[in-house]
């Protein structure tokens, strides 16, 4: 399946100022993310930004880049603008790769893109949680699926709740219990991506602070690729940045 990767990138970050331009082994983080995405088999990889410094860094490293408006409320709105600007057809598949994922698995990008079909205009990914601390951590978003592998719900709460297992103990994952952690990687059919910014915000989205709940609220199915490999986390803190720098220094 042919697909386009668009990477939204902004300089605004409360914990890591200028994060997309952070040096990782001689290259800016946003360039490292683009290079990983290029290994996925994407037909094209484009950075979407509203900042001249990010634009210049991409040009310097020969990474395709597109300037966008500065008033987008989310990365999804930003990539929708770029998909329209470059003239992607309605049937094109667009993958949104976060700009702070320099170690993202290229095969995960491709696997998520392949889930897009005539009946399913959006897809994402997940993996099984193996640590009990993650089960109860509200910063770890969980997803439950139907028998077809489509999302029933995303939540910061512990879902599904193992009634009998947790009645005995909450110190270990009960036998036979395999909750899924959501991975923030999204693929879209472009026709739906262009409709997305017009969808009204849902009450559930506001309660959980999870943008993807807007899609389920409006009755749009989301397919979920379950990977057996826990992905390397993105760069959100100075400690994350140091860890990734050590990787690229090897």
Curated annotation (Swiss-Prot):
- GO biological process, any: CMP-keto-3-deoxy-D-manno-octulosonic acid biosynthetic process
Tell me the Pfam families matching this sequence: CTP_transf_3
Q: Which reaction does it catalyse?
A: 3-deoxy-alpha-D-manno-oct-2-ulosonate + CTP = CMP-3-deoxy-beta-D-manno-octulosonate + diphosphate
Q: Where in the cell is it found?
A: Cytoplasm
Q: Which SUPFAM superfamilies match?
A: Nucleotide-diphospho-sugar transferases
Output the Gene Ontology cellular-component terms. cytosol
Q: Which PANTHER family match?
A: 3-DEOXY-MANNO-OCTULOSONATE CYTIDYLYLTRANSFERASE (PTHR42866), 3-DEOXY-MANNO-OCTULOSONATE CYTIDYLYLTRANSFERASE, MITOCHONDRIAL (PTHR42866:SF2)
What is the designated name of this protein? 3-deoxy-manno-octulosonate cytidylyltransferase
Q: What is the lineage of its organism?
A: Bacteria, Pseudomonadati, Pseudomonadota, Betaproteobacteria, Burkholderiales
